[in-house]
């Protein structure tokens, strides 16, 4: 996938603490680079980085799951040339998972940004065939960005 300069990207943080934590992991420019590598589409993409409380509330409201999850994608529309979506990232969950999986937080966040962008474009992992297709694409995109296979146990 190639980058598209017509993609408007809005990066939001839920609090000054989340903003400070995010800046220690990746700059806005780097996050935008990861996004543009994951989608050739134009449109509007909003990324919101939240704490566990907000992550849990959103997951409960929209998925009826009463825990904070790493990433939630809300695609509003997409076509072959444009998309509109909000993607929510829960930084405490991402940090915890990275540690448990023996990955850097930066590598795990890059993976989840690519993952969320693919969801925004209509990719899913509800069935094995879809999962394999999505994972293969994630691995290829992350490799181009300089990251190893996120499905390996250590990085």
From Swiss-Prot:
Zn(2+) binds at residues 115, 119, 125. This is Endoribonuclease YbeY. InterPro entries: MetalPrtase_cat_dom_sf_prd, YbeY, YbeY_CS. Transmembrane segments: none annotated. Pfam families: YbeY (PF02130). GO terms for cellular component: cytoplasm. GO terms for molecular function: metalloendopeptidase activity; RNA endonuclease activity; zinc ion binding. Single strand-specific metallo-endoribonuclease involved in late-stage 70S ribosome quality control and in maturation of the 3' terminus of the 16S rRNA. It is an enzyme of class 3 (hydrolase). Binds 1 zinc ion. Keywords: Cytoplasm, Endonuclease, Hydrolase, Metal-binding, Nuclease, Ribosome biogenesis, rRNA processing, Zinc. GO terms for biological process: rRNA processing. Belongs to the endoribonuclease YbeY family. It comes from Polynucleobacter asymbioticus (strain DSM 18221 / CIP 109841 / QLW-P1DMWA-1) (Polynucleobacter necessarius subsp. asymbioticus). Its EC number is 3.1.-.-. Its cofactor is Zn(2+). It is found in: Cytoplasm.
């Amino acid at each position: 996938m190639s980058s598209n300069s017509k993609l408007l990207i809005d990066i939001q943080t839920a609090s000054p603490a989340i903003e400070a934590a995010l800046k220690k992991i990746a700059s806005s420019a780097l996050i935008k680079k990861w996004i543009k590598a994951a989608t050739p589409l134009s449109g509007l993409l909003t990324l919101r980085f939240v704490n566990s409380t907000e992550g849990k509330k959103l997951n409960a409201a929209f998925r009826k799951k009463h825990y904070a999850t790493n990433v939630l994608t809300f695609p509003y529309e997409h076509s072959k040339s444009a998309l509109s979506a909000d993607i929510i990232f829960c930084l405490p969950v991402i940090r915890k998972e990275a540690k448990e999986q023996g990955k850097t937080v930066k590598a795990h966040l890059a993976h989840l940004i690519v993952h969320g962008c693919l969801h925004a474009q209509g990719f899913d992992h509800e069935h094995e065939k879809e999962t394999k297709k999505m994972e293969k694409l994630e691995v290829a995109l992350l490799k181009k960005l300089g990251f190893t296979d996120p499905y390996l146990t250590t990085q």
